[in-house]
């Protein structure tokens, strides 16, 4: 039998893996671009002031940049934890992934407003609401993966832990929305509690094979 007579059967799992890799690469690019765009409000400004005065004027924007950068970074890590276990996908999963990426890509805008108007109630509420929506969408995204059993080697306890961890941002940011109407400074200070909640929800998640 010659080589020309050989017909290799397509490997469906190989096609699924390649398609999932494309989803992951595209998602990584969106996360990276969004995190990079966060720095744009720090560029420019008054150049007639001494350097330390320029930095002082940028403190609110530095605050917003640092918080958003680390929150997006946490979601990128969570996205990686989910998709390293995904072995199959459907249009529903792709759509939820796109909705999450939409929220991530949108975040530089409320971040810029939050840094530019640090004492404004509207900018504070808008920022907290934007991150809350991102957190809720991500939770639905993770739930969808778990519900359809697209994890590999993840038990129910671990799945619940991952869903709970995805709620860490909404748990912190949703209550700060009404608080902002009473005291903007307190509301903004509470945002950093997200890292405490994240630590409490950290748990140990077994690596995928």
Regions found by a protein language model. Name each.
Residues 2-209:
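Multi-pass alpha-helical transmembrane bundle typical of ion/small-solute transporters
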């Amino acid at each position: 039998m010659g080589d020309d007579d050989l017909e290799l059967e397509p490997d469906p799992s190989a096609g699924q893996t390649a398609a999932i890799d494309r989803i992951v690469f595209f998602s990584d690019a969106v996360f990276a671009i969004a995190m990079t765009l966060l720095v744009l409000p720090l560029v420019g400004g008054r150049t007639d002031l001494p350097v330390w005065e320029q930095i002082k004027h940028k403190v609110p924007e530095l605050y917003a940049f640092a918080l958003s950068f680390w929150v997006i970074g946490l979601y990128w890590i969570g996205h990686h934890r989910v998709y390293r276990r995904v072995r199959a996908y459907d249009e529903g999963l792709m759509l939820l992934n796109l909705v999450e990426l939409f929220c991530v890509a949108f975040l530089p805008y409320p971040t810029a407003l939050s840094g530019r108007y640090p004492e404004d109630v509207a900018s504070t509420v808008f920022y907290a609401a934007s991150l809350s929506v991102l957190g809720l969408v991500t939770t639905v995204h993770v739930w969808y993966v778990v519900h359809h059993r697209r994890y590999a080697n993840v038990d129910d306890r671990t799945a619940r832990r991952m869903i709970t961890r995805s709620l860490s941002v909404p748990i912190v940011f949703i209550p700060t929305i009404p608080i902002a109407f009473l005291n903007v400074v307190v509301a903004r200070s509470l945002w950093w509690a997200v890292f405490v909640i994240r630590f409490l929800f950290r748990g140990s998640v077994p690596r995928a094979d």
